[in-house]
């Protein structure tokens, strides 16, 4: 089932960030929400997920869906390792071989994933947060600036893993980078 925005508006004080926005995100579709900083892209994602209420309009089809997200601030548990962060978010059902494959796919070494995430670089943390969202049991995955701070090789590897892990789930990628849509094979909105 798709998620539909119908005439959604949102303001913060005097600043109108969304005005009469209507759009449909089909189940299994990859969409990049594009635009420069401050245009309301993250606010739109938060409204879709039910974390913010629109001032006007409605979101249809989101109720009952499971969401996973990697926002710009990673919100990882500092004292846990990369492995621990995935287990914490995804549950005990996440097995070692699947985790090892995921870490390798985005260029994290076995040594990297055993360290507390507080000791990892920004790019490494970004990849852990990305995996946490992708591996969670979710119908909709929201990735806010998912490749920010990654070098080109890491961007390519991470994007390939995102495409592989999408697997019928709706993907909303929030970005201002035009190349992200091409990397993900996503529709631009």
Q: Positions of the model-derived regions?
A:
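Conserved ABC ATPase signature
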Residues: 116-120, 124
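Conserved ABC ATPase "signature" region
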Residues: 96-112
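ABC-family nucleotide-binding domains
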Residues: 144, 151
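Q-loop/switch helix immediately C-terminal to the Walker
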Residues: 79-94, 98
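Conserved signature/switch motifs of ABC ATPase nucleotide-binding domains
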Residues: 136
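Hydrophobic anchor residue at the start of the ABC signature
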Residues: 130
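The feature captures the beta-strand-to-loop junction immediately N-terminal to the Walker
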Residues: 34-36
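Helix-to-loop junction immediately C-terminal to a conserved catalytic motif
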Residues: 49
